[in-house]
Regions:
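Active-site regions of metal-assisted phosphoester/phosphodiester hydrolases
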Residues: 1-36, 60-61, 65-240
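Extended active-site neighborhood of metal-dependent phosphoesterases/phosphodiesterases
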Residues: 57
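Active-site neighborhood of divalent metal-dependent phosphoester/pyrophosphate hydrolases
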Residues: 13, 40-47
Length: 240
């Protein structure tokens, strides 16, 4: 079977024009038409307006199941990572990878049932902005409790905003355990941040070799160039 996944830091739906417009993010996601989507920097305040209850509004509008992994508690809700899926969710877990004294960070795992008795494990990550912080977080991600968890029998995909624009320790550690869908190899225009004139490659996708990468797209539609300060990164896989 073929599977399309995407990672997208939506910057709380705040575009480069500084306007909060969830509808623009929805338009971008419809253009991408992915089966599984990892979002970062999402507000989820239940019962509030679409500008504040972004996770629920986006999921309902595009008709996908969703799960929220909060990294920061807010009054009446959370801020953090979200996984959207066309497939049923079997289980989820939110890992705290915060480094003391730094901004709260997390890794949201979603176990997705892509076929009867067949799961795919999605890890949605948003790492810190400091080098030493990311080094600690990279080591934590490959710990047995997260990426190396032997209780997880399906293929793994780890994707998100890694805040590393060069081959730092975190990305090298992950590349030693997973295959890197390196946009510098697959795409001529590889930068994902900031949106209109991107010059940094912050967003990455890693996967197990039981999956075949068939193609990658850095989605650069007119609305995507303004909807967030990141561009969405999309990968097409064939599941063996």
């Amino acid at each position: 079977m073929r599977l399309r996944v995407a990672t997208y830091n939506i910057h709380k739906c705040r575009g480069l024009d500084r306007r909060v417009r969830p509808q623009r993010i929805i338009e971008v996601l419809r253009e991408i038409n992915a089966d599984i989507i990892a979002l970062q920097e999402v507000l989820s305040i239940a019962g509030q307006s679409r500008e504040k209850d972004q996770a629920q509004f986006i999921a309902e509008e595009i008709g996908m199941t969703h799960i929220v992994g909060g990294t920061r508690m807010l009054k009446g809700g959370v801020y953090g990572n979200v996984v959207l899926s066309r497939f049923p969710l079997l289980d989820t877990h939110n890992y705290d990878i915060t480094v003391l004294g730094r901004e709260q960070r997390g890794c949201l795992r979603a176990d997705v049932e892509i076929a009867p008795d067949r799961a795919l494990h999605i890890f949605n990550v948003h790492l810190g902005t400091a080098y030493l912080e990311r080094r600690h977080q990279g080591r934590k991600l490959i710990d047995e409790a997260i990426l190396s968890n032997r209780d997880l029998k399906g293929a793994r995909i780890m994707l998100g905003d890694f805040n590393e624009w060069t081959r730092g320790l975190a990305t090298r550690l992950l590349a030693s355990h997973l295959v890197s869908a390196d946009v510098r190899v697959h795409l001529p225009r590889a930068k994902t941040y900031p949106g209109v004139l991107p010059f940094l490659h912050l967003d990455h996708i890693y996967f197990e070799d039981s999956l075949d990468l068939e193609g990658m797209v850095l989605h650069r539609s007119r609305v995507a160039l303004i909807a967030s300060d990141h561009l969405p990164l999309v990968a097409d896989f064939r599941v063996k």
